[in-house]
Curated annotation (Swiss-Prot):
Name by which UniProt lists this protein: Transcription factor kayak
SUPFAM superfamilies in alphabetical order: Leucine zipper domain
Primary location class: nucleus
Location of this chain's protein in the cell: Nucleus
GO cellular component terms, semicolon-separated: nucleus
Annotated region described as Basic motif, given as residue ranges: 452-454
Length: 792
C-alpha cells in the first residue's frame, strides 16, 4: 500500500493484479462454457430425429449470414483498435493507460466505444485541471496563502482523478459480466430451439466456429492485459507525479517547488529504486578468493625499480590505468584481480625477479617469510593511501565505479604529496615501518655485496620453506592423531551402547522369565545345608555345596504340594517361629529359609543345622543388647534341632500334666527338667511321626507367667531306650548325662550352679512388655525373653 502526503492509502497500484484476476476468471468461465456446450451436443445427438434433413439448407443459410455479420464486426473492431493505438503513440504516456484499458474491454466484442470515450474525456479534463492547479501553485510562490490553496486544489484534483479511474474500471467490469451472462442465455435458447433440427455435421461446424471466436476474443483480452501490465511503470510515474506535485521543500527559509519538466521522481530515480528492489530480492553473489589465497595489498600505482627505489607516476597516468581497467571489465565483480594483473611489479616487499620467483607454482617460498626486511621498506604514505584501494573484495558488482574513483583519488593524493615536498624517492630514504634491519643504500653496495645479499635471500627462502614444511608435517601428524582418537572414542561409545542394549535385553528376558520359572519356586520350598550352615540359592546354582551338605524338603505327612504351599505362606506372613510347624525327621526353620532366599536385599544370614550328634547342643546366637539384629528370632531364627516324637495316648492327660508348652521332644534343654514326671511317659517308644502329636503342636497355647516347680505326686518313670528294661530313672538321654538337684525347688542360683552345663552370659532374666509384644508366638521357653544361654 502506498501513502500520500496526507497519510491516506490508495489501491491504484494494484490494478495490474486486478487485471490478472479478471483474466483468470475469464478463463474459468470459458472452460465452463465449453463443458456446457459439450453436454448440450451430447443431448442433441441423443435427441436427433431422422426427419431433420429437410431443414439443413435453411439452417446453413442462416449460419452463413450470421458468420458474415460477425466478420464485419471483427474488422470494424480491429480498425478501431489500430486507430486508437496510433493515437496512443502521439499522446501523453499518462493517457495511454485509460486507452489500453478501453482496448482490452472492447476486445470482448462489446459496443461501448461511446461510453469509453466519454469517460476518457472526463478523465483527461480532470487531469488537465490538476496540472493547471499545480502550475498555478508553482507560479504563485510570492504569497504563502495562495500557494497553500493551489496545493490543496491540486491534491483534490488528483484524488478526484483516482476516484474516477476506479469507478470507470468498476463500471466496465459490471458491463462485461452482464454481457457475458446475456450471451450465455442466448446460446442456451438457440440450442433448445434448434435441438430437433440441427444436423450432426452442422453441430460440429458451429462448435468449431464458436471455438475460433472464443480464441480470438481471448487473444485480444490477453494482448490488452499485456499492454496494461507493460504500462505499470507509467501508472507508477503518473501517481508519483500527482501525489508529490504539491510537496514543498524548504531550504534555509526559501520555499521551492518542483517544476513540471523536472518532477520529484525522475526516471533515473525510479530506475535506481527498481535496481535496489531487484538486488534485495535476488541473492548476493559472494565471490571468495580463488583457492583460498588472498593477494597482498597494492602500493600506489608506481613502478619499483631494481634498486629498491619507487618512482611514483602522475595522477593522470593512474587515472588512465584505472579507467582502462574499469572500461575493459565493466561487469567484473572483483576489479582488484585485474589491478593485480596490471600492476604485478608493484607488490610490496620484493623486486621484480624475487616476485616472479615467489609467484611461481613450483616453489614453496614467498616474500613475506624472509628474514631480510630491507626490501620491505616502502613509503608509509603510499602504504596508507594505496593499501585501501581494493577494499575487501566482497562488495560484488555494485560499487565498482566507486572503488575505481577511490583508487584514482588515492594515487593522485600520493603524487601530490610527493610533488609538494619536492623530494624524490631516489634522493631521500623512505620511512621505515617498524622493526627490522636498517636498509642499505643501493649506491654504497658493490656487486659482491649484492651477490651475497641475493645468496642470503635464497638461503633464507629455503630455510623458511623447510620450516613451513616441518610445521605442516607436524600439523598433519597432530590432525591424524586427533582423528584416530576421535574414531576410537566413537567406537567405544558404540560398544558401550551395544553393551547397554544387551544388558537391557537380558534384564527384560529375565523379568519375563521370572514369573514362569519353576526352579525359583523349588528353591523357595527347600533348605540346602553346606558344612552345617544354610546355603542361599546363589550357592546352589554355583555348585559350591559339596558332599557334606544335606538337602531337606519341607513336607508334611500328607505329602501334598498344596498343603506345603499353604503352610509356607502362613508361616511367612505371620513371622511365626518355625518350631511349631515341624514334624518328626524334617528340618524346621522354613521361615529362615524363605527370608534368606526370598529377600535379595537382606544380608546373608547363615544358620547352623544341627546333626544327630548335636541334638542337645543347641546353639542360638542372640544379641547382647535389647535391639534386634539379623540373628534375632523375630524375622530370621535359626532352625532348632530335629527331635524324636513319641505318641501320646491321651492329649487331655498330657496337657494337664504339662503346665508349659514344649516341643514334641521332651529331652530338649529349652524346657525345665523336673524331678518327677507323669506316668504316661512310660508308654513312649511308639511311632515317631504320630499325627496326634503334630495336631497337638498346632493348637494355640497360653503363655505361662511363672515357672512350675512343684514336685508331682507320681514318680517319673521313663523306660530308657536301649536298656534291658529296668525301671530306674534315666541317667542320660542320647548320650547326654542328666544331673538333677536333690531338692525340688529351683531358684536362679541353683539353676546357675546346678551342674546343667550352662553358664549365663547376662544378668537375671526379666520379662518386659516390649519383648512379649515382639514375640507373641514364640513358646520354646517358660519365659517370654529369648534364651541368653550359650554352650561351653
Amino acid at each position: 500500500m502506498m501513502k500520500n502526503l496526507n497519510g491516506r492509502t490508495h489501491n491504484a497500484c494494484y490494478q495490474p493484479y486486478y487485471q490478472q484476476q479478471l483474466q483468470l476468471q475469464q478463463q474459468h468461465q470459458q472452460q465452463q462454457q465449453l463443458q456446457q456446450q459439450q453436454q448440450l451436443l451430447q443431448q442433441q445427438q441423443q435427441l436427433q430425429l431422422p426427419y431433420a434433413a429437410p431443414y439443413n439448407q435453411l439452417q446453413q443459410q442462416q449460419y452463413t449470414q450470421q458468420q458474415y455479420y460477425q466478420q464485419q464486426l471483427q474488422q470494424q473492431q480491429q480498425q478501431q483498435q489500430q486507430q486508437q493505438q496510433q493515437l496512443l503513440r502521439q499522446q501523453q504516456p499518462t493517457l495511454s493507460v485509460y486507452q489500453q484499458q478501453q482496448h482490452a474491454k472492447q476486445s470482448y466484442g462489446h459496443n461501448n466505444s461511446n461510453n469509453n470515450a466519454n469517460m476518457t474525456q472526463t478523465a483527461r479534463s480532470n487531469m488537465q485541471t490538476a496540472s493547471i492547479a499545480t502550475v498555478s501553485a508553482n507560479g504563485n510562490n510570492s504569497s504563502s496563502s495562495s500557494s497553500n490553496a493551489n496545493a490543496a486544489n491540486s491534491a483534490t484534483a488528483a484524488m478526484a482523478a483516482m476516484c474516477q479511474m476506479q469507478s470507470f474500471l468498476s463500471q466496465q467490469q459490471q458491463q462485461q459480466q452482464q454481457q457475458q451472462q446475456q450471451q450465455q442465455q442466448q446460446q442456451q435458447q438457440q440450442y433448445h430451439n434448434n435441438c430437433a433440427h440441427i444436423n450432426y455435421n452442422q453441430q460440429q461446424q458451429q462448435q468449431q466456429q464458436q471455438l475460433q471466436q472464443q480464441q480470438l476474443s481471448t487473444a485480444a483480452t490477453t494482448n490488452g492485459d499485456k499492454l496494461a501490465l507493460d504500462n505499470a511503470s507509467e501508472i507508477a510515474n503518473f501517481l508519483a507525479s500527482e501525489l508529490f506535485m504539491q510537496q514543498l521543500v524548504t531550504f534555509d527559509g526559501m520555499q521551492s517547488a518542483p517544476t513540471l519538466t523536472t518532477p520529484t521522481l525522475t526516471p533515473t530515480t525510479l530506475r535506481t529504486i527498481e535496481e535496489t528492489i531487484y538486488e534485495l530480492t535476488t541473492e548476493p553473489q559472494i565471490v571468495p578468493f580463488q583457492a583460498g589465497f588472498k593477494p597482498p595489498p597494492l602500493t600506489s600505482l608506481g613502478a619499483i625499480t631494481n634498486n629498491n627505489t619507487v618512482t611514483p607516476t602522475t595522477a593522470a597516468a593512474a587515472a588512465a590505468a584505472t579507467l582502462a581497467v574499469v572500461n575493459a571489465n565493466p561487469i567484473n565483480a572483483n576489479p582488484q584481480f585485474d589491478l593485480l594483473g596490471l600492476n604485478c611489479n608493484s607488490v610490496r616487499g620484493s623486486d621484480t625477479e624475487d616476485s616472479n620467483g615467489s609467484w611461481n607454482d613450483g616453489q614453496l617460498n614467498d616474500d613475506q617469510s624472509t628474514t631480510d626486511t630491507s626490501s620491505a621498506a616502502t613509503d608509509s604514505t603510499s602504504y596508507q593511501n594505496g593499501g585501501h584501494m581494493l577494499g575487501n573484495g566482497s562488495n560484488g558488482g555494485v560499487n565498482n565505479f566507486t572503488v575505481a574513483l577511490a583508487a584514482v583519488n588515492n594515487a593522485g593524493r600520493a603524487s601530490g604529496q610527493a610533488g609538494g615536498n619536492s623530494t624524490t624517492s631516489n634522493s631521500g630514504t623512505p620511512a621505515r615501518r617498524g622493526g627490522g634491519r636498517r636498509p642499505n643504500k643501493a649506491a654504497n653496495m658493490s656487486p659482491e655485496e649484492e651477490e651475497k645479499r641475493r645468496i642470503r635471500r635464497e638461503r633464507n627462502k629455503l630455510a623458511a620453506a623447510r620450516c613451513r614444511k616441518r610445521r605442516v608435517d607436524q600439523t598433519n601428524e597432530l590432525t591424524e592423531e586427533v582423528d584416530a582418537l576421535i574414531k576410537k572414542g566413537e567406537d567405544m561409545k558404540k560398544e558401550i551402547e551395544n553393551l547397554n542394549a544387551t544388558k537391557n535385553q537380558l534384564e527384560y528376558v529375565l523379568q519375563a522369565h521370572r514369573p514362569t520359572c519353576q526352579k525359583v519356586r523349588n528353591d523357595l520350598l527347600s533348605v540346602v545345608t553346606c558344612n552345617g550352615l544354610i546355603a542361599p540359592t546363589t550357592l546352589l546354582s554355583a555348585g559350591s555345596c559339596t558332599g557334606t551338605g544335606s538337602q531337606h524338603s519341607n513336607n508334611n505327612n500328607n505329602n501334598s504340594s498344596n498343603n506345603n504351599n499353604s503352610n509356607s505362606s502362613n508361616n511367612n506372613n505371620n513371622n511365626s517361629n518355625s518350631n511349631d510347624s515341624s514334624s518328626g525327621g524334617t528340618i524346621t526353620g522354613f521361615d529362615a529359609t524363605l527370608n534368606s532366599t526370598g529377600r535379595s536385599n537382606s544380608p546373608l544370614d547363615l544358620k547352623p543345622v544341627l546333626t544327630d550328634e548335636q541334638l542337645l547342643q543347641h546353639i542360638k546366637n542372640e544379641p547382647q543388647d535389647v535391639g534386634l539384629d539379623s540373628s534375632s528370632s523375630l524375622d530370621q531364627d535359626g532352625p532348632p534341632p530335629a527331635k524324636r516324637c513319641f505318641a501320646l495316648p491321651n492329649i487331655a492327660a498330657l496337657t494337664a500334666s504339662l503346665t508349659t508348652p514344649t516341643d514334641p521332644g521332651s529331652c530338649s534343654l529349652n524346657t525345665p527338667i523336673t524331678s518327677t514326671a507323669p506316668n504316661i511317659f512310660a508308654n513312649f517308644g511308639g511311632d515317631l511321626n504320630s499325627p496326634t502329636l503334630n495336631a497337638l503342636n498346632k493348637l494355640p497355647k497360653a503363655r505361662p507367667n511363672t515357672l512350675n516347680v512343684q514336685q508331682l505326686q507320681r514318680p517319673f518313670v521313663v523306660q530308657q531306650l536301649g536298656n534291658d528294661g529296668n525301671k530306674a530313672p534315666p541317667t542320660q538321654i542320647q548320650g547326654v548325662p542328666i544331673q538333677t538337684p536333690s531338692t525340688g525347688t529351683f531358684n536362679f542360683d541353683s539353676l546357675m550352679d546346678g551342674g546343667t552345663g550352662l553358664t549365663p552370659v547376662s544378668g537375671p532374666l526379666v520379662p518386659t512388655c516390649s519383648s512379649q509384644n515382639k514375640h507373641p508366638l514364640e513358646l520354646p521357653t517358660p519365659t517370654s525373653e529369648p534364651s541368653k544361654l550359650v554352650s561351653l
